[in-house]
Structure formats: C-alpha cells, structure tokens
Amino acid sequence: MINDRFKIEVIKSSELSTFFQIYKPNIDYPKLQEIFSGTLELCYNQDDVSFTNVIHVCFDIKEQKYCALLNIGTTTDIDDIVSIDIEFLFVEKEYRKIHFEELGNIKLSEYLLIDYVVLTIGETIKNQIGINTVALTPATNKIRELYSSYGFQTIQGSGSKEAEDWMVFNL
C-alpha cells in the first residue's frame, strides 16, 4: 500500500491471464499497444531465464479501479551491465495530468518512476545485490524530455536508432 488512495500489487506470472480478464488497459496509441503486446510476451515467457519481467499494477482505492501498469525486469543490453529495466509504463489517460495531493502533489507517472521504481525497488536492490542503474527506452521524444526532467540521462548511440537510445538513472 502506498497510501490511503493508491496501492501497488505485483501480479504473479501464473495469474496474468486471469488478471487481464479483469483489467484491460485502455491503451490509446497504436505504438503503445504494440509495445504492450511485446512486453506481455516477456512476462509470460518465464521458462527462459534471460527474461525476468514482472507486472506491477497500481490500484486506485477511492475509485476502485486499476489506473497504471508497470513491467519491471532486468537487462544487460547496456554495455553488458545489469540494470533494472522499466520495460513498460502505462498510466490510464484520466490519471495522466493530475498532480495528486496523496502523492505529494506529483503526477502518478512520476511517483511510479521515481518514488516506486527508483527509490523503493531500486534502492532495495542496490543495497541487497548491487545493481546500480534503472534503465528505460521512452516511447516518444516528448516522454524522453519528461524522463530527462526526472533525472534520467540518455546514452547516445545505445539503441538501434536514435529514438531508441536507452536512458538511465544512476542509483
């Protein structure tokens, strides 16, 4: 539980099919739908040890509905250094521009990226097993600018195309 308004749940791979019968993200861009489909394949493919992705969902207790989804795993795609990988972050449209008082007057996406992944998960993993970076690849340049304002840095030339360059947050 984050606070009285939101809680984050981890969905076990064995429960994904059942969960996505209950919650169908309202993905409003074709490119995001393509990324979402690809990211789900990573979660279902738990037999391959190179895939370590886990779905985390945010539930709005007040409104009694799911409002965001994260796919978090690990990657060695950046110079063979293990990083926490935010494979996918999706926030339902009606939650995107709101600064929530319950979250310290920040947007839900910022809370999920910085407070939840970087500060909660990232710091715990850093202290316990020594992974020191959180990595992601933004879907658009506009999102890249937003993540840059949160402290993520672009690693030029790290993607197959410039728009696919990795961004990292050093813990």
Predicted segments with their positions:
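Non-catalytic substrate-recognition and accessory regions of acyl/acetyltransferase enzymes
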Residues: 1-103, 111-112, 116-139, 144-171
